[in-house]
């Protein structure tokens, strides 16, 4: 009976956190929409990206503490019970929005994972959960964050279960992760946010040719994911070696991004660049779209901007 009560308590806590995560995801996504509208109204906003980079670096250095570890501390929290700073969620929310506002090429999944993991980790600690129960709550928070921020609760559930232990699923977290991912997404949609929907007009026959192309694409995408993680790693390493002052490194890194946007006309690659999915589905993608987005994103994140999904070298998302 005690074990059943503990399981119920874990599930109830996870579900309550997922409702809050749904609210946060709604607010976060609306802020990103407002940032995109601002960039459309003021196309030259990227000239202030170096200022945003300096402020971000300064705040994280002075009051961020372990928050600067980003997703890695969430992974350690789920696996080893590492304490997550309470300020992590608010810092990554605010500075991701600022980066988007001034034209940085960053995403939303890294921010969502950090917010969801930070929220559930601190709630679990406050309520006295330990070991596997605590880990399950944190994993459900990651699932609810991913599912609600993308509107993909099924994928979010698996992401939460697998992201902390690449290649293996946490069996005890299956029900909480699925329930929380769907509930958080329901809350986000209930509040009125409309996620993008990408219709597949026709499904090809599952024959040998399709399987071959599918496997080749999977290998290529895995390699691109690996190159993305390595790109961020080595850009960060280069800046740290060239510039001893962290504020100067952030300023120069952001300035390079701004100059590239200006010189090459890369305004369309600022922020999320969700238009790229639409052109891909329509078959209208240009050959330079992917390299341009890759370059701008790696340089933005390498300069120190938040909202990244780069994990430890042996646990990158490209290994999933």
Task: Locate the predicted segments by residue.
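Alpha-helical transmembrane segments and immediately membrane-proximal extracytoplasmic
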Residues: 1-318
């Amino acid at each position: 009976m005690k074990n059943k009560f503990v399981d119920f308590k874990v599930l109830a806590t996870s579900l309550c956190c997922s409702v809050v995560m749904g609210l946060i995801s709604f607010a976060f996504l609306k802020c990103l929409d407002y940032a995109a509208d601002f960039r459309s109204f003021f196309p030259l906003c990227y000239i202030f990206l170096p200022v945003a980079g300096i402020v971000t670096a300064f705040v994280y250095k002075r009051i961020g503490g372990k928050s600067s570890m980003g997703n890695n501390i969430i992974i350690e929290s789920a696996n080893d019970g590492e304490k997550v700073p309470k300020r992590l969620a608010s810092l990554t929310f605010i500075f991701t929005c600022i980066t988007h506002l001034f034209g940085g090429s960053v995403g939303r999944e890294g921010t969502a994972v950090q917010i969801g993991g930070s929220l559930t980790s601190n709630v679990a600690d406050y309520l006295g959960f330990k070991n596997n129960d605590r880990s399950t709550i944190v994993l459900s928070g990651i699932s609810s964050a991913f599912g609600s921020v993308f509107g993909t609760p099924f994928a979010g559930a698996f992401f939460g279960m697998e992201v902390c232990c690449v290649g293996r699923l946490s069996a005890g977290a299956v029900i909480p992760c699925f329930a929380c991912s769907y509930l958080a997404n329901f809350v986000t949609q209930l509040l009125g946010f409309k996620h993008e929907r990408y219709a597949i007009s026709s499904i090809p026959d599952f024959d040998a040719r399709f399987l071959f192309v599918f496997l080749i694409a999977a290998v290529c995408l895995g390699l691109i994911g690996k190159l993305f993680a390595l790109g961020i790693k080595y850009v960060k390493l280069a800046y740290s070696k060239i510039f001893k002052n962290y504020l100067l490194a952030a300023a120069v890194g952001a300035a390079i991004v701004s100059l590239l946007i200006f010189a090459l006309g890369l305004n369309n690659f600022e922020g999320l660049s969700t238009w790229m999915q639409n052109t891909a589905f329509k078959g209208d993608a240009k050959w330079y779209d992917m390299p341009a987005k890759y370059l701008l994103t790696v340089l933005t994140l390498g300069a120190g901007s938040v909202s990244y999904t780069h994990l430890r070298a042996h646990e990158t998302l490209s290994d999933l």
